[in-house]
């Protein structure tokens, strides 16, 4: 991975995110080929209903995205997890918010695994 190209890509994506907000959550991390990536989480002060969700990763490789959420009703916590293989070269990947459930959520988390080359990624979640 060319670090200069990666730094420019991250800077460009961050500028687009800053101009396109507001977002409920913006998650970002790097993934190393053949390793499980870190899980990144955004917790909300109050339950939120997600709208548009977009995932974008750097380069031409593929990565497996694990997207999860928790929703609390009274004392019951319901978790939802979705796994998708994403081709980074195809540009931003739109994710149907119904994959996180149809009720307001308390948090959203994302992790990547099975990257076939080193990459970095952004996930944005807009409100409904």
Regions found by a protein language model. Name each.
Residues 69-100:
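An anionic, turn-rich surface loop/hairpin at beta-sheet edges
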Residues 1-52, 58-62, 124-128:
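Extracytoplasmic low-complexity, Pro/Thr/Ser/Ala/Gly-rich segments
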Residues 61-78, 122-127:
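Short, surface-exposed beta-strand/strand-loop-strand elements in extracellular ectodomains
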Residues 24, 37, 62-64, 77, ...:
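Polar low-complexity intrinsically disordered regions enriched in Ser/Thr and small residues
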Residues 35, 42, 54, 77-79, ...:
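Residue-level signal for the start and early helices of compact helical domains
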Residues 36-38, 49, 59, 80, ...:
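Residues that act as N-cap/strand-start positions at coil-to-secondary-structure junctions
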Residues 48-54, 96-121:
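Noncatalytic modules at the cell exterior or secretory-pathway interfaces
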């Amino acid at each position: 991975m060319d670090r200069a190209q990666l730094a420019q890509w991250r800077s460009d994506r961050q500028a687009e995110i800053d101009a396109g907000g507001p977002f409920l959550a913006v998650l970002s991390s790097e993934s190393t080929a053949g390793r499980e990536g870190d899980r990144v989480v955004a917790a909300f002060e109050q339950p939120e209903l997600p709208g548009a969700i977009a995932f974008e990763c750097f380069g031409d490789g593929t990565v497996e995205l694990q997207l999860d959420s928790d929703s609390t009703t009274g004392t019951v916590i319901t978790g939802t997890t979705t796994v998708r293989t994403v081709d980074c070269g195809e540009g931003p990947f739109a994710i149907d918010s119904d994959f996180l459930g149809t009720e307001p959520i308390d948090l959203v988390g994302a992790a990547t695994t099975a990257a076939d080359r080193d990459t970095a990624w952004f996930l944005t979640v807009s409100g409904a």
